[in-house]
Amino acid sequence: MTNVVVVGSQWGDEGKGKIVDWLSERADIVVRYQGGHNAGHTLVIDGTSYKLSLLPSGVVRPGKMAVIGNGVVVDPHALIAEIGRLEAQGVTVTPDNLRIADNATLILSLHRELDAMREDAASNSGTKIGTTRRGIGPAYEDKVGRRAIRVMDLADLDSLSGKVDRILTHHNALRRGLGVAEVSHQAIMDELTSVADRVLPFRDTVWLFLDKERRKGSRILFEGAQGTLLDIDHGTYPFVTSSNTVAGQAAAGSGMGPGSLGYILGITKAYTTRVGEGPFPTELKDAIGEFLGEKGHEFGVVTGRKRRCGWFDAALVRQSIATNGITGIALTKLDVLDGLEELKICVGYMLDGEQIDHLPASQGAQARVEPIYITLEGWKESTVGARSWADLPAQAIKYVRQVEELIGAPVALLSTSPERDDTILVTDPFED
């Protein structure tokens, strides 16, 4: 038995929600370790859809413990609203099935406002990143700047006032520079005191809780949000998120040691998508790109934004295999490729007349690369709902084998529809 870390191996939206839900049935604890409420996913259980963006997937399953780790930035209002939506669907959320790290950073209204002001200013100058305007980046900035308000601070109103003073010294200086009205001390105090009683019951010393559970032999599933190529260090900077999304963050963002992480499962879509700005070497701006977007329902859960679509990029996924230490992948949305006469896979790039096997880190070089493709024959038969290799067309199996060979990692799971049980299990990550 081992613990499992789930990471996205592309730009997010790889189908992590379904795979995490599939695995969470067998886990005891599901841990979120980075990001905020900027990356959503939909779980379908017994025909009911649950939309989550901050809460770990385990929260909708009876008998499971969901944990929000210290690496997550928590918007208390978004948290309360999400709990309310789940309770309206009959899901009970109490400290018996949800714990939040007492040292997790809080997202405040001033973070959301700063995020939006920056994006508006950047839109006018052509340097827009394409954030969700939810305050994620500014909250992480305050965390690194050592001025953040954390969950534990809600329990100590006597010292909270001084911490609010410190954060406002920074933010009001920024607001004056942007020509925006300053935020009052009382407004932030009111904002925090209004949510304290709803948030504090869930707080815990998460590293200690997880260590005790590990020693008891509990199965722990670490749930990543977004994807490797949005990692602040290893992604397509500056068009990235504000946290580390690679598997190593599961340790830092939860308080578990790296030796406890176990199997690293990379969720990998059978084609490529991206939301927002930034380089995308295999992007298809033609009828095939439209086909993938329509058939794959490529619209963001949180923002509703249309995703950009393109061919599978083996060179990028190879990089993700390396930077995460991925043990095996879960290949998702194979069924979206049904009916295409031919399929292409990017195996490398041409850059200024030279062939390279990885995407360079330089923004300028990323914009100049041209993908090198191999072409495979497609298949006409449907793969929707396949639950064994015998259910798959020969060409679909050939495509999967080609992907494995090109990325240098085996397929552990193969997903053939949004339904949880439409999954071909090759290797059980929990038993590896």
Curated annotation (Swiss-Prot):
Q: Which SUPFAM superfamilies match?
A: P-loop containing nucleoside triphosphate hydrolases
MF GO annotations: adenylosuccinate synthase activity; GTP binding; magnesium ion binding
Q: Name one GO cellular component term.
A: cytoplasm
Catalytic activity annotation:
IMP + L-aspartate + GTP = N(6)-(1,2-dicarboxyethyl)-AMP + GDP + phosphate + 2 H(+)
EC top class, in one word?
ligase
Q: In which pathway is this protein known to take part?
A: Purine metabolism; AMP biosynthesis via de novo pathway; AMP from IMP: step 1/2
Q: Which SMART domains match?
A: Adenylsucc_synt
* InterPro entries, per database record: Adenylosuccin_syn_GTP-bd (IPR018220), Adenylosuccin_syn_Lys_AS (IPR033128), Adenylosuccinate_synth_dom1 (IPR042109), Adenylosuccinate_synth_dom2 (IPR042110), Adenylosuccinate_synth_dom3 (IPR042111), Adenylosuccinate_synthetase (IPR001114), P-loop_NTPase (IPR027417)
On cofactor binding, the record's note says: Binds 1 Mg(2+) ion per subunit.
UniProt-annotated binding residues for GTP = 12-18, 40-42, 307, 333-335, 415-417
The protein's UniProt keywords, in alphabetical order, are: Cytoplasm, GTP-binding, Ligase, Magnesium, Metal-binding, Nucleotide-binding, Purine biosynthesis
The active site lies at: 13 (proton acceptor), 41 (proton donor)
Q: Name one GO biological process term.
A: 'de novo' AMP biosynthetic process
Location in the cell reads: Cytoplasm
Q: At which positions is IMP bound?
A: 13-16, 38-41, 132, 146, 226, 241, 305
List residues traversing the bilayer.
none
Entry binding sites for substrate? 301-307
UniProt superkingdom: Bacteria
Pfam families from the UniProt entry: Adenylsucc_synt
Family, similarity comment: Belongs to the adenylosuccinate synthetase family.
Q: What does this protein do?
A: Plays an important role in the de novo pathway of purine nucleotide biosynthesis. Catalyzes the first committed step in the biosynthesis of AMP from IMP.
Q: How does it assemble?
A: Homodimer.
What HAMAP family does the annotation carry?
Adenylosucc_synth
- Indicate what this protein is called per its UniProt record: Adenylosuccinate synthetase
- Please tell me the species this chain comes from: Rhizobium johnstonii (strain DSM 114642 / LMG 32736 / 3841) (Rhizobium leguminosarum bv. viciae)
Traced from the root, the source organism's taxonomic lineage reads:
Bacteria, Pseudomonadati, Pseudomonadota, Alphaproteobacteria, Hyphomicrobiales
